């Protein structure tokens, strides 16, 4: 494959792509992005990638008694190209988490940072590798703003 562009799929996009579930048909922006994703799948210059953490996040939802689905989707995710989570990624994710926590604490804003602990890794992976993160998580834009504040430090 002659890849020119890579795109990192978040677990929600893996779910949309592989299972066709959780698609809000009233969300015009999501439908447009999924239509674009289908175009990307057929584009030989684009490679869709995941990380071991995304694999874990996607596959952990299949219960012990769902072996057939688990095995089917485990085989499907094995077909993606993998990006390792490097030290640079963990450093960036750690620093973004620390800054986010500091800002929330200093403003007295309660924030569920634990809910975002995987997403900050996905975001950092995309940033370190210079690729786009395809996600439907609403707080990714907030992470982009946080990243810009971190860069300005």
How would you name each of these model-derived features?
Residues 1-6, 26, 40, 123-153:
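Acidic, PIN/NYN-like endoribonuclease modules and their adjacent C-terminal/linker elements
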Residues 11, 52, 56, 116-120:
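Conserved glycosyltransferase catalytic-site signature
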Residues 1-50, 60-74:
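Short, well-structured N-terminal submotif of metal-dependent ribonuclease cores
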Residues 82-132:
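Active-site neighborhoods of divalent-metal-dependent phosphate/nucleic-acid chemistry enzymes
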Residues 81-86, 149-153:
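Short acidic-hydrophobic, aromatic-tinged amphipathic segments that line or gate anion-handling sites
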Residues 14, 55-58, 140-141:
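A generic structural signal for short hydrophobic patches within well-formed alpha-helices
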Residues 65-68, 100-101, 150-153:
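Short, hinge-like loop/turn segments at secondary-structure boundaries
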Residues 53, 85-88, 138:
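Short beta->alpha linker loops
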